């Protein structure tokens, strides 16, 4: 499996943008789902408290998105799914892999006592599912467009249609023509 630096860099950019979209829309989904959970706050308070927790959390979240995007850009073309489905599938795969760790947050996270209960909460699960689906969709579409190959050349109109409007005989195909038996 060869790895292209340019493909990897464009994937990282797509992942960083997708993570930023995720983080920017969190206030809206907190209102929709009724769960005051902020991923950037979770990441930031794992490292520090106070005024720098949220900006640091945004940086960590964006960096994580870039790493995920770089990996995605190199793996996704080999996944046997339609290109439009690869990003959402990757986002949901990450969700399924990481959601069980929310059961450990109250005990292991430095700010665990201050975090809302996520494990066992249907609205929190729905909120996290939405976020991962959004992330995967933005990542997949942006990476696909950034790393798209050259567009196939479309033949000119004159090349496929003759002056009589029916095409060229040279381009006609004959199916089922049987040669007479010479015997």
Feature map (PLM): residue ranges:
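Short amphipathic, positively biased membrane-proximal segments
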Residues: 1-183
């Amino acid at each position: 499996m060869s790895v292209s630096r340019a493909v990897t860099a464009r994937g990282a950019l797509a992942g960083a943008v997708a993570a930023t979209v995720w983080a920017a829309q969190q206030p809206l989904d907190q209102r929709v789902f009724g769960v005051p959970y902020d991923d950037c706050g979770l990441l930031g308070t794992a490292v520090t408290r106070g005024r720098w927790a949220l900006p640091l959390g945004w940086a960590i979240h964006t960096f994580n998105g870039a790493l995920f995007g770089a990996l995605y850009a190199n793996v996704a073309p080999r996944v046997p799914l339609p290109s439009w489905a690869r990003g959402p599938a990757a986002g949901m795969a990450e969700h399924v892999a990481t959601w069980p760790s929310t059961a450990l947050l109250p005990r292991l996270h430095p700010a665990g006592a201050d975090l809302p209960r996520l494990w066992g909460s249907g609205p929190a699960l729905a909120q996290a599912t939405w976020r991962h689906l959004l992330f995967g969709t933005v990542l997949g579409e942006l990476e696909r467009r950034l790393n798209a190959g050259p567009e196939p050349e479309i033949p000119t109109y004159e090349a496929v249609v003759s002056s009589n409007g029916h095409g060229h005989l040279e381009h006609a195909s004959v199916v089922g023509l049987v040669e007479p038996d010479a015997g």
